[in-house]
């Protein structure tokens, strides 16, 4: 089966660089499956889980808080704001992050659209982290 090259990079380090049969990324418009030969595009990512597939099975799962992905017919490059393997996330840590994000939202000036959007993105990413930690 043809494969696509996948690279996942966070500000701290390159987390992953290898070939996969398929990768599913949490695009802002919804989950997006990337197979070899995919149409070129750049997509905005929302908080969620990236799933890597080999032989029809999920082999790895990584949490991302957001970022961008560049897709070409040969490769998918993810530039993540924050990223880490799902196995390294504890439910307690994720729930604390969600509580902190909700507390920060409560203090935001509701007339400041930019701050409100940022607070909502933090809550969405924290909810995605909680969901990832539970699976």
UniProtKB/Swiss-Prot annotation:
A molecular function (GO) held by this record is: proton-transporting ATP synthase activity, rotational mechanism
Subcellular location(s): the record lists:
Cell inner membrane
Query: Keyword annotations for this protein?
Result: ATP synthesis, Cell inner membrane, Cell membrane, CF(1), Hydrogen ion transport, Ion transport, Membrane, Transport
**Coiled-coil intervals:** none
Please give the chief subcellular localization of this protein: membrane
Any GO CC annotation of this UniProt entry: proton-transporting ATP synthase complex
Concerning CDD domains, the annotation shows:
F1-ATPase_delta
Keyword tRNA-binding annotated: no
Tell me how this protein sits in the membrane. Answer: Peripheral membrane protein
- Superkingdom: Bacteria
Write down the InterPro entries for this protein, in alphabetical order.
ATP_synth_F1_dsu/esu (IPR001469), ATP_synth_F1_dsu/esu_N (IPR020546), ATPsynth_dsu/esu_N (IPR036771)
Q: Which family does it belong to?
A: Belongs to the ATPase epsilon chain family.
Question: Which proteins does it associate with, and in what oligomeric form?
Answer: F-type ATPases have 2 components, CF(1) - the catalytic core - and CF(0) - the membrane proton channel. CF(1) has five subunits: alpha(3), beta(3), gamma(1), delta(1), epsilon(1). CF(0) has three main subunits: a, b and c.
NCBIfam families in alphabetical order: ATP_synt_epsi (TIGR01216)
**Function according to Swiss-Prot or TrEMBL:** Produces ATP from ADP in the presence of a proton gradient across the membrane.
Q: What is this protein called?
A: ATP synthase epsilon chain
Name of the gene this protein is made from: atpC
